[in-house]
Regions:
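Short, conserved beta-turn/loop elements at beta-strand boundaries and strand-helix junctions
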Residues: 80-85, 114
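Beta-strand/loop substructures that line and gate deep hydrophobic ligand-binding cavities in soluble
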Residues: 94-138
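Short beta-edge strand/loop motif at the mouth of beta-sheet-based domains
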Residues: 13-14, 32-71
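Hydrophobic/aromatic beta-strand elements that line small-molecule binding cavities or substrate pockets
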Residues: 16, 72-78, 103-111
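Short hydrophobic/aromatic-rich beta-strand segments that constitute the beta-sheet cores
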Residues: 54-56, 84-88, 119-121
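Short acidic N-proximal helix/loop "leader" segments that mark the beginning
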Residues: 1-11
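Short amphipathic
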Residues: 10-18
């Protein structure tokens, strides 16, 4: 008998409202000098054209804890600055998760009233149960 301990989560959607312009949000996501301030200890690099590379690089703290230098790799599927970014996301921090198929992350940036911008992040996790379990903190 086999027991599957991985969750069935296939899509995560996060929506947040930020008092900033769409361009400022775009820059915070896509420019390494900005995203290293807000993300995990490290930086993300994007080649913002369809087929361009995405890389999340571990900072010194993460590497000191045993993480590899290249944490996540992927490909830019669509880039429409400063409105929409679609990318694949393939974590590499352990063998089990690296063996799974890449997932897909969509960043939708929409200007709202009063100088506020709505950021919606959709992470499609189909066919990646280990990734789903880890990113939903259920592993």
């Amino acid at each position: 008998m086999t027991t599957d301990t991985h969750t069935a989560v296939t899509t995560q959607v996060y929506r947040v409202y930020i008092k900033a312009t769409p361009q400022a949000i775009w820059d915070a996501i896509t420019k390494p000098e900005w995203n290293e301030r807000y993300g995990y200890p490290g930086r993300s690099e994007f080649d913002l054209r369809p087929g361009g590379a995405f890389r999340a690089i571990a900072g010194p703290q993460a590497q000191a804890m045993g993480m590899p230098e290249l944490l996540v790799e992927g490909e830019v599927v669509e880039a429409d600055p400063p409105r929409r970014l679609v990318q694949t996301w393939h974590p590499l921090w352990d063998e089990e998760i690296a063996a799974e198929s890449p997932t897909r992350v969509t960043w939708d940036i929409e200007e709202d009233d009063g100088g506020v911008t709505r950021l919606t992040v959709t992470h499609e996790l189909e066919n990646a149960p280990v990734t789903a379990a880890q990113v939903t903190s259920t592993a």
